[in-house]
Design a protein with these regions (language model features):
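Histidine/cysteine-enriched polar flanking segments
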Residues: 1-261
Length: 261
């Protein structure tokens, strides 16, 4: 493990205690070299409370002292007023992510930096686009996450990634490539996507909650006051088996099927 087994286990336990997930990030085109300090982004993705913060730590072990449940209280932290995109480029987990993700990250970084207002930002907060370690969903590479909301997109090629970014800046979600939102369980994410697609809810804040009412039924609460019940079941796709990762054999595809009740 890049951090060593002991530190990696400690960080994982610390993040689990705060109901958080840890990702490595680096700026596109960099080799991930240690420059003497480490930039840290902390995203609060709970619907209605989304926020994004940045800070710098001297050592990776300093993560263990960060109260990531209350990032606004961390000394020296900066609240960001713009979205951030993460592109999975984790080639060790799946070479497809590196082959497809790195070019997308580089192009999107150029696009995003040109879509800012031109104001100078502190070094720790200037980057809008980052390469990241394994995000899951590698069979949908290139995979993209938009923070602070935690919206995840699949098959986000260069043109699609630019569209997703521009919509996020305007407070919108791209529905065609949307796979879910990190604040909810996997079937809960399928329920939200189904409701958004059915009623064309493209606003970032159009869905305010997803509640599990029974084992397979979810209540999707919308900002307009409406609520929709959705049954979600996991099943094997009707599509032919396909490789789960680059260079691997075919594997049957499991999918969540969502039905509005």
């Amino acid at each position: 493990h890049a951090l060593g087994e002991e530190l990696a286990s400690q960080i994982k336990a610390h993040m689990n205690a705060h109901n958080a997930r840890f990702q490595f990030i680096r700026e596109p085109g960099s080799g991930g070299q240690d420059s003497g300090g480490h930039r840290v982004l902390i995203a609060e993705s709970t619907p209605g409370h989304e926020a994004l913060y940045a800070t710098t730590i001297g050592s990776v072990s300093d993560l263990l002292s960060l109260d990531v449940s209350h990032p606004e209280t961390i000394p020296g932290v900066t609240a960001l007023d713009f979205p951030v995109a993460l592109i999975c480029t984790h080639g060790k987990r799946d070479v497809c992510c590196a082959l497809k993700g790195r070019p997308v990250a580089a192009l999107l970084s150029q696009h995003a930096s040109g879509s800012t207002d031109g104001a100078d930002a502190p070094e720790t907060t200037s980057a809008r686009v980052w390469e990241t370690s394994h995000t899951g969903g590698h069979r949908f590479a290139p995979a993209m996450i938009v923070l602070p909301w935690g919206f995840t997109y699949g098959r986000a090629g260069a043109q699609a990634a630019r569209q997703i970014w521009d919509l996020a800046v305007d407070g919108q979600v791209e529905l065609d490539m949307l796979r879910g939102r990190s604040a909810f369980s996997k079937p809960g994410q399928a329920a939200e996507v189904a409701v958004r697609s059915r009623f064309h809810l493209t606003g970032l804040a159009d869905v305010v909650a997803v509640e599990n009412t029974t084992e397979s039924v979810f209540r999707v609460v919308c900002a307009d006051g409406n609520a929709h019940s959705v049954e979600v079941v996991q099943t094997v796709s009707d599509l032919p088996a396909r490789p789960a990762t680059c260079g691997k054999g075919d594997k049957e595809v499991k999918v969540f099927r969502a039905t509005l009740l």
